[in-house]
C-alpha cells in the first residue's frame, strides 16, 4: 500500500535454517549471473542483504481449512507488527491462537484464508512477532476483518490482552516459486 513501512515491499525467502539462508545469500551475492539480474532489475527491487530479517514462521492451522488459494498463486496479505503487552509472552500468544482457531471453526464463510506467525528473536524494534493473514482477495480480507470485529469475542479479547498490533502492511501477493510444487513458477 502507499502507507507501507518498507520502500521495497515484503520479499520473503524461506529456508530451513538461518545457516542455510546465510550460505545461500553469500552464494547469491557472489554469483555473476545474480549480480547481472539485480542490476537489470534494480528499478523493480533492490536486495538489501544487510536489512534481511530473521523470523521463524509457523502456520497454526491447516492452510486449506477454508479452501485452496487461487491456482495462479496470487493472494492478498496483511502483515500486522505486534508487541507483547507487559508480562505477556509467546505462551500467552499460543493460548490466544487456540481461541482464534476455535473462533475460526465457528465461522460459516467461503473463500481461501490462512494465517501464520513470524516469531522474532527480540532484535526487531517494530515487532516481537508479525501476524500474517493470507486472503483470497482484498475483498475477502475486508469481510474477514469485519467478522473479527463483530464476533471475535473471547479470541479477540485474549489476543488484545496479549499483544498490541499496529496497522498492517497490505500487499497483493504471489508465489514466485514453491519447492513443494517445482513445476509451478512465475516467469
Predicted regions and their residues:
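Short S/T/G/P-rich N-terminal loop/turn motif that feeds into the first structured element of a domain
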Residues: 1-187
